């Protein structure tokens, strides 16, 4: 949609929420996982590749804070970093994701080494981080508004995975449970920022485009996993059966 006249805050929120039609919960890869149709390799591949996204989130949030001159906003935003990195002796989301990896049969080194991260996933996640570093802090902050749709996807995993994949250990589900409340809290802050900052049709159109950019990132990650784990066409599959792609953060 193209906004020609500035929307009211409520109408703008409705436009943002309408973007949920493009959330990756509707991607065939995620639908297969939800319906119990994914193989062990596909579940493991998803967990290993999403870990790269998880470890990039605190870097993204630190970049937003570095560009934000408002102390009150920084005090609220820093909680996102603590949620993932942990604080006061408590483990955060990254540690919880490592336990998810172990619960699906991967070692911690499988995830920490990043050797399973597909180039398409790495490029998509790096694009998100680079945007957060270069955009104005308000736009970078509001790119996180895919959180509007996150509680549904976390709940769907909690509802469907235990019955479809009994081989996944129970302790692996802690991350999804913890994010149910954290995501709702983060949404309130992010929405308030978006509705305050986007006070013109131009800004509202741009913010919708930024939210679509973030949705594109999440969808593209699953496209890369589909090629590798569903269609059995990982990078360079026509010339080698080995993982020949780069496996480290180069910048």
Swiss-Prot record:
Keywords: Oxidoreductase, PQQ biosynthesis. It catalyses: 6-(2-amino-2-carboxyethyl)-7,8-dioxo-1,2,3,4,7,8-hexahydroquinoline-2,4-dicarboxylate + 3 O2 = pyrroloquinoline quinone + 2 H2O2 + 2 H2O + H(+). Pfam families: TENA_THI-4. GO terms for molecular function: pyrroloquinoline-quinone synthase activity. The keyword Lyase does not apply. Gene3D superfamilies: Heme oxygenase-like. Its EC number is 1.3.3.11. GO terms for biological process: pyrroloquinoline quinone biosynthetic process; sulfur compound metabolic process. InterPro entries: Haem_Oase-like_multi-hlx, PqqC, PqqC-like, Thiaminase-2/PQQC. Pathway: Cofactor biosynthesis; pyrroloquinoline quinone biosynthesis. HAMAP family: PQQ_syn_PqqC (MF_00654). Ring cyclization and eight-electron oxidation of 3a-(2-amino-2-carboxyethyl)-4,5-dioxo-4,5,6,7,8,9-hexahydroquinoline-7,9-dicarboxylic-acid to PQQ. Belongs to the PqqC family. This is Pyrroloquinoline-quinone synthase. The gene is pqqC.
């Amino acid at each position: 949609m193209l906004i020609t006249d500035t929307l009211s805050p409520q109408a703008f929120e409705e436009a943002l929420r309408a973007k949920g039609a493009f959330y990756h919960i509707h991607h065939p890869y995620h639908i297969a996982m939800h319906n119990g149709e994914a193989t062990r390799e596909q579940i493991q591949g998803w967990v290993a590749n999403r870990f790269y996204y998880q470890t990039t989130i605190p870097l993204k949030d630190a970049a937003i804070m570095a560009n934000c001159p408002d102390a009150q906003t920084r005090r609220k935003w820093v909680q996102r970093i603590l949620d993932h990195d942990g604080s006061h002796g408590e483990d955060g989301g990254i540690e919880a994701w490592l336990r998810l990896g172990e619960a699906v049969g991967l070692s911690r080194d499988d995830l920490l080494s990043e050797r399973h991260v597909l180039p398409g996933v790495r490029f998509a996640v790096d694009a998100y981080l680079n945007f957060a570093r270069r955009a104005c802090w308000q736009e970078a902050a509001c790119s996180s508004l895919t959180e509007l749709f996150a509680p549904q996807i976390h709940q769907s995993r909690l509802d469907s995975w235990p019955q479809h994949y009994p081989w996944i250990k129970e302790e692996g589900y802690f991350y999804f449970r913890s994010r149910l409340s954290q995501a709702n809290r983060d949404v309130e802050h992010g929405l308030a920022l978006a509705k305050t900052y986007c006070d013109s049709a131009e800004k509202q159109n741009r913010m919708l485009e930024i939210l679509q950019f973030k949705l594109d990132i999440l969808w593209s990650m699953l496209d890369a996993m589909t090629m590798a784990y569903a269609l059995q066409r990982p990078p360079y599959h026509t010339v080698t059966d080995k993982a020949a792609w780069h496996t480290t953060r180069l910048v």
